[in-house]
Amino acid sequence: METATTLEIASCSQRQVEEAADPADAEGPQTTRQQEAGSPSLQLLPSIEEHPKIWLPRALRQTYIRKVGETVNLLIPFQGKPKPQTIWTHNGSALDNSRVSVRNGEHDSILFIREAQRTDSGCYQLCVQLGGLQATATINILVIEKPGPPQSIKLVDVWGANATLEWTPPQDTGNTALLGYTVQKADKKSGLWFTVLERYHRTSCIVSDLIVGNSYAFRVFAENQCGLSDTAPVTADLAHIQKAATVYKAKGFAQRDLSEAPKFTQPLADCTTVTGYDTQLFCCVRASPKPKIIWLKNKMDLQGNPKYRALSQLGICSLEIRKPSPFDGGIYTCKAINALGEASVDCRVDVKAPH
């Protein structure tokens, strides 16, 4: 359509020139040829075989984010034939050639920044012009870095095992929105930092479950897409978690009465022994308070007799008859006596001569 229109304009101009020429002029044909060769109105306009159009990559249709120091290398393909003219602008102004370089090819244009800085952020526009036609594409570039630290942090209150903190936002957010704050604690003894809250969006918080008897310091980092701030302010005061004074009131209770009159749980057993061989008699008694143990032979007290040795320990009573003779045979009695009563057990001992 564009080619046909251009040819029609050229034919019409040529007819107008021929009609205006005088046939009687001696130099008519020569002058006409000169006019045809030299008149600007007779020059044919270049034909547009392909309209200009920019094929913007999908990734660049939203804000293109890079970190400070990274390389920006954008290739933007376009169409247009013959080769169109390409013009780049940054925020409506020409590019700074000391920082940004552009390479234009037959079918694409490359925008290159070796080390991006925050000042390189903004709106970049590519304009492709061909004849009276043009196509434009806009690319938003955002160069970001780590945020600065919060300006201050203050320990507001300490109660029980809890501490209240407040801080102010950082002055520099790194050229992008903050994702939140990271709160950490460290006890005075170990000095190790542990994270309490991550990506916390408020500028005040309550730290709970602190250990009684410890003293804690706190610090806060700011965070954005690049990560945590390089430094963090630390509370000037320590949070001392005091042990609450507890008053114990003893409950009254009835003391159990364990008093008991003597009672033999294991009686004496009758035995037969041989003359000259030591013999022992055993029995068990239970009583509270501790009873007095008395040994009798044929109802005669044996206390103080060196031939016999009486022992009593943990309720076990024993009587040793040293080298018995036939005279030592008889009825032996063990008697237990305390304030609540008394009890006794008997056994018969026979002493035989050896065969």
Swiss-Prot record:
Compartments, as annotated in UniProt: Cytoplasm, Myofibril, Sarcomere
Record-linked InterPro entries: FN3_dom (IPR003961), FN3_sf (IPR036116), Ig-like_dom (IPR007110), Ig-like_dom_sf (IPR036179), Ig-like_fold (IPR013783), Ig_I-set (IPR013098), Ig_sub (IPR003599), Ig_sub2 (IPR003598)
CDD domains from the UniProt entry: FN3
Annotated family: Belongs to the immunoglobulin superfamily. MyBP family.
Bias type Polar residues, positions: 1-15, 29-43
Disordered: region residues: 1-43
Gene name linked to the record: Mybphl
Disulfide bridge positions per record: C283-C334
Keywords: Cytoplasm, Disulfide bond, Immunoglobulin domain, Methylation, Phosphoprotein, Repeat
Function (record text): Myosin-binding protein which plays a role in cardiac function. Seems to regulate conduction in the atria and ventricular conduction systems.
Domain Fibronectin type-III: 149-244
GO cellular component entries: myofilament; sarcomere
Protein name per the record: Myosin-binding protein H-like
One matching Pfam family: I-set
Swiss-Prot/TrEMBL GO biological process terms: in utero embryonic development
Omega-N-methylarginine: modified positions: R322
Domain Ig-like C2-type, first and last residues per copy: 46-140, 262-346
Phosphoserine PTM positions: S39
Domain of life per record: Eukaryota
Organism phylogeny: Eukaryota, Metazoa, Chordata, Craniata, Vertebrata
